Amino acid sequence: MTTNRWVIHNGKFAVSEGTNWNVVQGFMVVENDKIVHIGETLPEGDESLTKVDGKGLFFLPGLINTHGHAAMSLLRGHGDDLALQVWLQEKMWPMEAKMTSEDVYWGTSLSVLEMLKGGTTAFLDMYDHMDQVAKVVEQSGVRAALARGVIGLCSEEEQLRKLEESAAFARQWNGQADGKITTVISPHAPYTCPPDYIEKLVQVAHDLNLPLHTHMSETLREVEQNVADYGLRPVAHLEKLGFFSRPSLVAHAVHLNDEEIEILAKHDVAVSHNPGSNLKLASGVARVPDLLKAGVTVSLGTDGPASNNNLDMFEEMRLAALIHKGVSGDPTAVPAGEALLLGTSYGAKSIFLNDTGALQVGMKADFIALNIEQAHFYPHTDLISHTVYSASAKDVEHVWVDGKQVVKHGECLTMDEERILRESQLAFDSLLAR
């Protein structure tokens, strides 16, 4: 294999050390898909490497979106200002029932285009027609953990079909796209999957040695219904069903008590905090400071584009840093540096990736560059703070995944933006007319 070794010079790099951040001015050397050097000086012998000028740019680990439904970009704006169950039952599920694999392909393409251009280099997706999602991931060069989301409110025959689809997809695609695709087993939620069905999906995860992902405790109504149906709150319910016997990520986790936080910490369960979606659907505000204090890994997700309604991870970091200050009355809650960890390295851990999420030697070369020669970044007092409190997806200038540039000067190099915009509009129009 030919070695591709090159260097970014004259750049500013966000380097995390534990829970702290340093801004290093100097050089970063990339060899093939890995970061091999980062520091104030260039290693001896590397003077003749191909150089990328980092002047005016701030380099960060790629952002990681740990919960979403990419194809739902086709339903953006279709059902706003509604409570979760009304939104799902009256607006989303009837439309989703009509979606074809082609719809999923174009909806996912639209979302991946938005994510890449906005600095997201890895994401977790739970949906149907996941072979189409995987094709988009493979074509675009993004990194993804993918799950065929399974709803069990159906006949036993259909439950079995969905379970087999989930397992087949997971086997077929795990490790594909040069390792950029990993797979997950994903019952949709305790309120949409009977207990015995969740147990069967947990067994599939054991059989395939894969992690698990689900929605959990998103609304107070969901928690109360779980107690009424099963005599347990969702966390204890999932623990009883063996869900946490596999590496696990739960989305939302808004309504938790102290005992539930202890259970999540005991089993090393990660939480995907979705502040934008939770606010928009009036689901509530998760106890993120308490989760972090208990040692739970917390990351950030946008949820689907129909409940956010964008995929701007800078916005999620800023919301995470702001709302917990307002709710707790503590101005030190989720400081900027911690919010950036939620969007990067904690995200990698949450979606079971151990070689991305940080600018460090030996890590995958998944990183982004922000244009900081703009009014809202000045003065350059604290670039970590500016990233969380001032930046947006529109500030992303360049993006690399696996050492390959996928966005250059704000333009995606791996996707046909004009066609995606056209086809996604046609797909929605067709969906609405069915």
Regions found by a protein language model. Name each.
Residues 74-106, 113, 140-155, 160, ...:
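Active-site gating loops and adjacent loop-to-helix segments of metal-dependent hydrolytic enzymes
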Residues 1-26, 31-36, 341-434:
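Active-site microenvironment of metallo-dependent hydrolases
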Residues 280-282:
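Helical hairpin unit composed of two closely spaced alpha helices linked by a short loop
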Residues 240-247, 289-374, 388-391:
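His/Asp/Glu-enriched, well-ordered alpha-helical/loop segment
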Residues 132-254, 259:
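Metal-coordinating catalytic core of metallo-dependent amide/deamination hydrolases
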Residues 11, 28, 33, 56, ...:
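Divalent metal-coordination and catalytic microenvironments
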Residues 76-142, 165-176, 424-433:
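Alpha-helical scaffold segments that flank or form the walls of functional sites
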